[in-house]
């Protein structure tokens, strides 16, 4: 049975169920949800969290889904075991205060054991073992009742294995797992603990949410405050695990949606999966990471150095690196990505629709990584050459870590290349530094997590309201309302006085809360009792709640007072113009660069905006000019900007663009600029394109691999910028005595003349330097048999000092020992260069030793080889002492 059929049967089983009732099939959410505690959706229940936490009323009593998930805590372990991967699909059924334990057990057992011919999965009952939480006798009784299994077949496990919580106060409860016995080839009989996971494979976990947890200290240490008012069901079944069982495969990497990638990798590398353990790990890494990275890019992630982008970059580069370790050094992703697309695209059709964008991002990252490998190889070669010259045999952990951390050079390649040269690598030191870096990252993550404020006060206010705060700002900028909640210092309060910072919740508001790239409104709220507050910021910390961050200017604010809310109109209009301009620039870039130029982020502020979008390489100036011209053409056309609410399906049919990573409901708001640009958007906008006045693009830059940023001005801000530019051009024209259109040519001529003058100055300076070299060589002092030039060159920097020293050495008498040390100083910075000929080195003299001796005297250090060495320092006052030291040191060694 192929994976698509397993998925179809799962959804159909719940959608058409008549035992507990039909479940609403819910499409998979994006891998990216607005959750500060999650990089990616990592469980099937994540999109339903607001319902389980009581933040929102569920729109259905029962639901079923097959959710895309990514888990990346141990990327480096992927492939080493065959049970886990970074991307997986989690099949689940959910009950929100409807059926409970018995219904969940019946539904799961029925699907798992029902014969294939009847639409089930046909697993043998004799190989199935239910597990329960050891303190849940109700579950034991229900499993016996539903399945008829004897009690000894029902496995009791502790909190670590069979009690679920979110790791924080909130809902929790015991769970039951369905374990599949793979037989004695995979482990001993009866070991249902962690060591027996290979044999007794968990295929389905049923979570019975029944408890309210007041404190959670660890997986096994928590306090149960009482029972939840409504009991819920959350189940999760790993699609890939069931697939490899039903397809008769040894592990998830061999199922129909993954193994074709391994087969293609076999074809490319000439190696065979199953022939070598290390190669097998690499094949599995390739299969997993290609699929994971493709799905992440599909949902809008782009490679970067932080957070989601960094995870994607690691996945892509590990896949490329694994192919290299398998012996394939050509671009691999263009060969592998289409294989995964064809398999996953049967279910996730957007992979085909967005293929140009997905492939462009992935292939560009591989190209960048291949360049990194080339530069890293150069650094590696330098490090090993120095190591061999020093007589060493082990590359230090510091050097291996620097190659990995600074140059992106994988440790596996460092180990492989070192072994080829007969060298070892200090892996212990490398791992220590890696662990220290991981710990710093964890500490940073904890610190950032701590910055997210406790939402309990907001939930308390939201519960008291009973309905979402009504946003009226699409239609008005002033409105009458009443104060329904006050929050200060993280807690609910009843009043606030002059000078107090307070968060105010009204029952309705014209103030726009920051979101969708648009900054929040500002303004004032006037209370019926004469009090007045200044609104500095507006946020929506929990769904349905709009919170005004304010300072009380006068009077006292208390719950129940009537309020007159006044938005700063000019600021709102300016931001709205920026937001409309962002939509227009987005559309213009897609026209100029193609459909791959999708928005990756934005910020709309008063009079200016920034717009991030997917693109490979810098955008040519000609394209920037075309985009700016196109946008301003639409401004002159004065197209009406209008918004309408429709179903998401109708919005897609209308051609409206949706932004990756944004979460949309069944009903969406579509903003259109005439019939030209159409996007899903919840922000505020200008009434027509003509209201923008003028749009000026300031420039574009890279903010990460495959992502460019454009910054621009709108309206009066753009006009003022252009006016300043006009004045500047007029001043330059007057100064250079040419017309404005002749300025580029005139400036070019001036720059060329300046360059020629600089070259002439350099020729004169070098000539003077070389003339001095002849005089210095002729005046060399005799220190025993050695011709010594120890010279102070004030005003000479490092490059000149080196040139002078080498030239003087070449002018000393042939066949006699010669030593040259030149010490220069510019702006207090000291440069030291020593140059020796072969005869001097034969007498035991060393440029490296001379520079190392001089370095501390001039407040620095240095070194190099025996023939040429250089150094620097910061204490020019002791240069004469250094010259004396050189003379003494040469005399001492020469005499010995």
UniProtKB/Swiss-Prot annotation:
Swiss-Prot/TrEMBL GO biological process terms: alanyl-tRNA aminoacylation
Catalysis performed (reactions): tRNA(Ala) + L-alanine + ATP = L-alanyl-tRNA(Ala) + AMP + diphosphate
Subcellular location: Cytoplasm
SUPFAM superfamilies: Class II aaRS and biotin synthetases, Putative anticodon-binding domain of alanyl-tRNA synthetase (AlaRS), ThrRS/AlaRS common domain, Translation proteins
Co-factor note (free text): Binds 1 zinc ion per subunit.
Basic and acidic residues bias spans: 439-456
Enzyme Commission no: 6.1.1.7
UniProt cross-references to Gene3D superfamilies, sorted A to Z: 2.40.30.130, 3.10.310.40, 3.30.54.20, 6.10.250.550, Bira Bifunctional Protein, Domain 2 (3.30.930.10), Threonyl-trna Synthetase, Chain A, domain 2 (3.30.980.10)
Gene Ontology CC annotations of this record: cytosol
Stored Pfam families: DHHA1, tRNA-synt_2c, tRNA_SAD
Region spans: Disordered: 439-459
Cofactor dependency: Zn(2+)
GO molecular function, one term: ATP binding
Alphabetized SMART domains for the sequence: tRNA_SAD
Record: residues binding Zn(2+): 579, 583, 681, 685
Principal location: cytoplasm
PANTHER family named among the record's database cross-references: ALANINE--TRNA LIGASE, CYTOPLASMIC (PTHR11777:SF9), ALANYL-TRNA SYNTHETASE (PTHR11777)
Purpose: Catalyzes the attachment of alanine to tRNA(Ala) in a two-step reaction: alanine is first activated by ATP to form Ala-AMP and then transferred to the acceptor end of tRNA(Ala). Also edits incorrectly charged Ser-tRNA(Ala) and Gly-tRNA(Ala) via its editing domain.
Recorded family membership: Belongs to the class-II aminoacyl-tRNA synthetase family.
Name of the molecule in the record: Alanine--tRNA ligase
Lineage: Bacteria, Bacillati, Actinomycetota, Actinomycetes, Propionibacteriales
